């Protein structure tokens, strides 16, 4: 049975709601800057990251249903998990209109999610490293593209983060501060 988890709620828990079709598993389009130089074969391609893209589901209604509950469910921004990728989630927003009149009348409609380009492991817990006992710790990216981790440092003194034996980040905790968050996806 097809289902999604949206706003931390399983679609199968909404009376009368059916997820009749899930989106295909796709890779987002790469943003590129292409430069053509006269007299040079080909072009220079600069990769600029990935585009946000649409994932569309088809929904239906059956039996007893509350259209207002369905309308409320399919709104806003949240993490979404599709049952054909039930070990991953996407950060998504519903931005397009949904024809709920068609849904109520013909009991079918489409819902389009604007998803950010990366999907994340659903059950990946936080890693905790005690630097009093471990002076170094290796963390591997389990994905197939570059990783943009969120790192929370707790402690005092000087902390240095290396990537492939190259110092990437050094942080000195100011007096009285014991925690800092490095969100590499937001470059914050």
Sequence positions of predicted segments:
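Solvent-exposed loop and beta-edge segments used for protein-protein assembly and interaction
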Residues: 49-51, 74, 103-107, 141-145
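Beta-strand secondary-structure signal
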Residues: 54-58, 110-112, 150
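Solvent-exposed edge beta-strands and adjacent loop segments
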Residues: 1-54, 86-102
């Amino acid at each position: 049975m097809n289902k999604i988890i949206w706003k931390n709620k399983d679609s199968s828990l909404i009376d009368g709601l059916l997820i009749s079709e899930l989106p295909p598993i796709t890779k987002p389009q790469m943003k590129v800057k292409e430069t053509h130089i006269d007299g040079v074969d080909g072009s220079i391609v600069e990769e600029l990251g990935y585009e946000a893209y649409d994932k569309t589901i088809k929904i239906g209604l059956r039996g007893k249903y509350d259209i207002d509950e369905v309308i409320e469910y399919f709104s806003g921004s949240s993490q979404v998990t599709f049952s054909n990728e039930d070990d991953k989630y996407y950060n998504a927003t519903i931005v397009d209109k949904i024809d709920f009149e068609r849904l109520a009348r013909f009991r079918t409609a489409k819902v389009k999610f604007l998803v950010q380009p990366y999907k994340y492991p659903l059950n990946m817990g936080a890693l905790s490293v005690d630097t009093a006992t471990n002076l170094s710790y290796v963390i591997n990216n389990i994905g197939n593209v570059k990783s943009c981790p969120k790192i929370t440092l707790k402690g005092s003194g000087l902390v240095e983060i290396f990537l492939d034996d190259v110092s990437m980040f050094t942080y000195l905790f100011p007096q009285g501060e014991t925690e800092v968050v490095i969100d590499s996806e937001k470059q914050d």
